[in-house]
């Protein structure tokens, strides 16, 4: 299985690529959960398609225990997800205007943290 930093490094190369609602293409456009699903798939992980399901099937963690490579989830009904890259930052497919970008992990109050990594 992949090292946490490998997944982050892989995901970071797509910064600046487009946000496409319902998309799963790392180069032609993805939404938040499609971006996570496709990035993790590169390393043999099968994540569910939508953010809420990704949260449900992840191993839950306390925000104080967050590590590089963990997923940060947002919204009371979990509608958004980003990949924690360290230094209190995430990379995520944000909006159609900004695409895949780096943001502070607390740009919005996180609802939870989950991981698929050891």
Model-assigned labels for residue ranges:
Residues 13-68, 115:
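Catalytic cysteine-centered active-site loop
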């Amino acid at each position: 299985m992949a090292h946490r930093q490998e997944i982050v490094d892989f995901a970071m190369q797509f910064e600046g690529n487009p946000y496409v609602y319902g998309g799963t293409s790392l180069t032609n456009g993805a939404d938040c959960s499609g971006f996570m699903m496709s990035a993790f798939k590169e390393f043999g992980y099968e994540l569910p398609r939508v953010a809420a399901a990704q949260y449900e099937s992840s191993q839950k963690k306390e925000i104080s225990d967050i590590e590089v490579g963990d997923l940060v989830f947002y919204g009371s009904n979990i509608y958004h997800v980003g990949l924690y890259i360290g230094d209190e930052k995430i990379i995520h497919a944000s909006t159609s205007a900004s695409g895949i970008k780096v943001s502070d992990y607390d740009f919005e109050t996180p609802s939870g943290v989950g991981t698929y990594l050891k």
